[in-house]
C-alpha cells in the first residue's frame, strides 16, 4: 500500500513508512499509533522534553538515556519505543513530530479515513469532538481522524484544515476582519 502511492515524503516519510509497514506486518498498527500519540502528547506538555528532542547540543547517548527514562515512565514499549530509539541513534530525533504526523497519515489512509488538523482555543469535550467528526464525515464521506491542537491565541472558535481545505471560524480572524473593515471605512 505505502509503496504504491506514498502520502508522505522526506526523511520523516521514510521512517514513517518503514514503521507503518512493520506495525502492519505485526498487526499492531493501533497499538503503535496509541504509543506514538502518547509520546507526542508528552512532547507537547514538556518544554524540557521538547528541548531534548530538538537541540543538537545533546549527544545521542544523553538523548537515549533520557528517552529510555521517558519511555519507561510512560509505558511505551515495543515497535513504537524501538523506532524512537532508532531515531535517537541515527541523530534524527528532531524529526519525531513529523514522523508521527506522517505515520498517522499512513494509518488514516490505510483505514480509509481522512485526517483533519483542528486548532482550538481550549480543549473540546468528547461531545464536541464527536459532533465535529460527524460534521466532517458528512462533508468528506469518510471517517475523520482529528489532530487537535490547543492554541489560546485564536481566542475562540476553531480552525479546521482538511486536505487542501481550510475553515477558519476563529474569533481572532473575525476580529481582524472587523479591524480591516474599520480601517478601510475610516
Swiss-Prot record:
PROSITE patterns: ATPASE_DELTA (PS00389). Its main location: membrane. It is a peripheral membrane protein. It is found in: Cell inner membrane. Keywords: ATP synthesis, Cell inner membrane, Cell membrane, CF(1), Hydrogen ion transport, Ion transport, Membrane, Transport. GO terms for cellular component: plasma membrane; proton-transporting ATP synthase complex. GO terms for molecular function: proton-transporting ATP synthase activity, rotational mechanism. It comes from the Bacteria. F(1)F(0) ATP synthase produces ATP from ADP in the presence of a proton or sodium gradient. F-type ATPases consist of two structural domains, F(1) containing the extramembraneous catalytic core and F(0) containing the membrane proton channel, linked together by a central stalk and a peripheral stalk. During catalysis, ATP synthesis in the catalytic domain of F(1) is coupled via a rotary mechanism of the central stalk subunits to proton translocation. Belongs to the ATPase delta chain family. F-type ATPases have 2 components, F(1) - the catalytic core - and F(0) - the membrane proton channel. F(1) has five subunits: alpha(3), beta(3), gamma(1), delta(1), epsilon(1). CF(0) has four main subunits: a(1), b(1), b'(1) and c(10-14). The alpha and beta chains form an alternating ring which encloses part of the gamma chain. F(1) is attached to F(0) by a central stalk formed by the gamma and epsilon chains, while a peripheral stalk is formed by the delta, b and b' chains. This is ATP synthase subunit delta. It comes from Bradyrhizobium sp. (strain BTAi1 / ATCC BAA-1182).
